[in-house]
Amino acid sequence: MFINYSSIIEICVQWPELPKKDGDILYVHPNNLGDLANSIDDIHVRFVLVSCESDHPIPYGLFEESKKILYSDNVICWFSQNAMRTFSKLRHLPIGIDYHTIKTKTKDEQEQVLIDAKNSNTIKKNKIYGNFHFQMDIMFKHDREEALSQIPSDLIDYEESRIPRGECYKKMASYKFIASPFGNGMECHRTWEALALGCIPIVKTSCMDSLYEGLPVLIVNSWSDVSQELLDSYVYNCPNAHRLYVEYWINEIHKVAKSGLQVLKEDIDKALNTSYTFNNDDVCSEFSDEEVNLLATE
């Protein structure tokens, strides 16, 4: 099955239940990370933490709570969606495919719709498909505004109105490229939908770049870099296709849980030394302690 965070949550002990033995995997929604930080000293086993289902930028959206969690010797490793600073103890977890919004169909049924759409279009237009413009009032709206204004109009076809998901998947699958600016967080379901459909998502460079290593994701420094020459020269290559599937990520989490990884406090301090903020020029730029505190309140 393609990566989706609901399947990851299913393998976890779920907060407020606490891990009971070494190597347990604990899921905590980011809204409850403060409660976990306050209770961390009461947990006496070593566990792996998983957080997702939220657009909180980790660790800087909840900086003090995140530091306390990362400093705990009982936290083996933390896998997080929208992780803006990664190292051995804090690792990316993809947002993946949205199988949780539609409650009337199972994950398997929704995945089959995706697979059928992929198989319905084996010849793809050498153009970009865009449907991100229907939702602009979001945290990273500047990235979508820049994509709208800077991608040459002759290279992209925008959907005129919202269409059902299955129809949307078929439309996406008929294009070689999918424009995927940031969502309300720095990740977007659209990126992973595009990959599952055999398309090439185009994203702007960010703290998420390492998450896409070995996947056919076209990363640009600026949306103004998108050109016909760039599209023509990009070669589809997917040596890390296994990273598209939830089984890979579950295995990675279990592997780390069994490893008993130990990370020194000074290594954590070093990893957190550079902070990130969001601005129109560089989504991963340094910022002051005052700005860290401001971001932590958003």
Where do the language-model regions lie?
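Nucleotide-sugar donor-binding catalytic core of glycosyltransferases
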Residues: M1-W192, A196, I200-I219, D225-L295
